[in-house]
Amino acid sequence: MNMKNLYLAILYLLAASTLPFAIASDPSPLQDFCIGVNTPANALFVNGKFCKDPKLVTADDFYFSGLDKARTTESSPVGSNVTTVNVNQIPGLNTLGISLVRIDYGINGQNPPHTHPRATEILLVQEGTLFVGFFSSFPENRLFNKTLNKGDVFVFPEGLIHFQVNIGKQPAVAFASLSSQNPGVIIIGNTLFGSKPPIDPNVLAKAFQLDPKVIIQLQKKFG
């Protein structure tokens, strides 16, 4: 093989090796849906935020204060209170793919079964004892659970239903980081039984193998 052909072969191999990196998937959406429009009048950036002029950016755009303060859980029907720190609280998080929450749990309080459609979550227990877990997808439906104490860490994979329960004798506190500036949250009970407009009770009755009257009562409770 002469030098010219060798040179072309090397270029071909380099191009082939970089091809998988060039064929990348679309970025994950940061909102529930994005309807295509032909004019910008009713358009919205996919990440949900317009960018501030870099010359006007200040340190306060990257700052939030108050996560050291406990939140009351007494008024919560599930005995917990979630303080969210995402792009709506810290504008500087826009496009950075990360956010944070503080979760306060009363005695016997819980963060009920829910899912984050756009984020993996890593949770750190600061105070107390939590029983936590997540479920794998159908058909296995495996429950992965663990009892966590102060300093313990647990990961909830993106999109999977998970929960935390305070099983200690004192209030508990945890901090969690999520891999999205706007991870979203779907609380299973609230979504199914508190949807607007409400779903036909017969649909849920068949799905859960319950009397429709039970579903109607649940819809009244969550609605």
Swiss-Prot record:
Domain Cupin type-1 intervals: 65-216
Entry's localization field: Secreted, Extracellular space, Apoplast
InterPro entries tied to this protein: Cupin_1, Germin, Germin_Mn-BS, RmlC-like_jellyroll, RmlC_Cupin_sf
Residues that bind Mn(2+): 114, 116, 121, 162
Secreted as UniProt keyword: yes
SMART domains reported in the protein's UniProt record: Cupin_1 (SM00835)
Disulfide partners: 34-51
Glycosylation sites: 81, 145
Keywords assigned: Apoplast, Disulfide bond, Glycoprotein, Manganese, Metal-binding, Secreted, Signal
A single cellular component GO annotation: apoplast
GO MF entry, a single one: manganese ion binding
Stretch forming the signal peptide: 1-24
Function recorded in the entry: May play a role in plant defense. Probably has no oxalate oxidase activity even if the active site is conserved.
Subunit note: Oligomer (believed to be a pentamer but probably hexamer).
Family under the similarity heading: Belongs to the germin family.
Protein name: Putative germin-like protein subfamily 1 member 12
Source organism phylogeny: Eukaryota, Viridiplantae, Streptophyta, Embryophyta, Tracheophyta
